[in-house]
Curated annotation (Swiss-Prot):
Residues 1-102 form the Plastocyanin-like domain. One of its GO terms (cellular component) is chloroplast thylakoid membrane. It comes from Dryopteris crassirhizoma (Thick stemmed wood fern). Keywords: Chloroplast, Copper, Electron transport, Membrane, Metal-binding, Plastid, Thylakoid, Transport. Participates in electron transfer between P700 and the cytochrome b6-f complex in photosystem I. This is Plastocyanin. It is a peripheral membrane protein. SUPFAM superfamilies: Cupredoxins (SSF49503). The gene is PETE. It holds the Pfam family Copper-bind.
């Protein structure tokens, strides 16, 4: 599955912002435009340690951003469920999406 991160006019969005994949299927996030963004999965309160570890591994470091030098990032989640992801610098601008793993 592929997700575009941002756009040419600087909107803080993921396109699409809702994705459904099979367990273990990679999602490729690719930067569009020049504004730096990242992808971080929200770890649900009370999530088992294995799920928390998996979501942390599927996330970029909060201090890293996609750029022209590194324009894409692949994430994989194997545990079925619905997970929220967001861009750390633009979280307050509601730049988020959901990944459903079947």
């Amino acid at each position: 599955a592929k997700v575009e991160v941002g756009d040419e006019v600087g909107n803080f969005k993921f396109y699409p912002d809702s994705i459904t994949v099979s367990a273990g299927e990679a999602v490729e996030f690719t930067l569009v435009g020049e504004t730096g963004h990242n992808i971080v999965f929200d770890i649900p309160a009370g999530a088992p340690g294995t799920v928390a570890s998996e979501l942390k591994a599927a996330s970029m470091d909060e201090n890293d951003l996609l750029s022209e030098d590194e324009p894409s990032f692949k994430a994989k989640v194997s545990t079925p469920g619905t997970y929220t992801f967001y861009c750390t610098p633009h979280k307050s601008a509601n730049m988020k999406g959901t990944l459903t793993v079947k």
